[in-house]
Amino acid sequence: MKEDIKGFIAETAFADPREIQEDTLLFEEGIFDSMGLLNLISFLEENYGVRTDDTDLVEDNFRNLRAIEDFVSRKKS
């Protein structure tokens, strides 16, 4: 899952996937913006069946790859 999400982020942000590590701060390092987040949410819904509501839209859930993976795992269980 992590590599798929990383690949999606790299592709949509025109970033080198090697620069995106598990703890890379996606927003603070300018890799991600609000449009990128919307695209990611759609990707997670389509590929992992994760439904996101307004209370989920906090930076802690999407701060880095580790946080995104944890978020998906929580939502799927």
Task: Briefly describe each language-model feature range.
Residues 53-76:
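C-terminal structural segments of small proteins and small subunits
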Residues 13-31, 50-58:
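Phosphopantetheine carrier-protein modules
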Residues 34-41, 65, 69:
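Amphipathic alpha-helical interaction surfaces in cytosolic regulatory modules
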Residues 1-18, 70-77:
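Thiotemplate assembly-line natural product biosynthesis machinery
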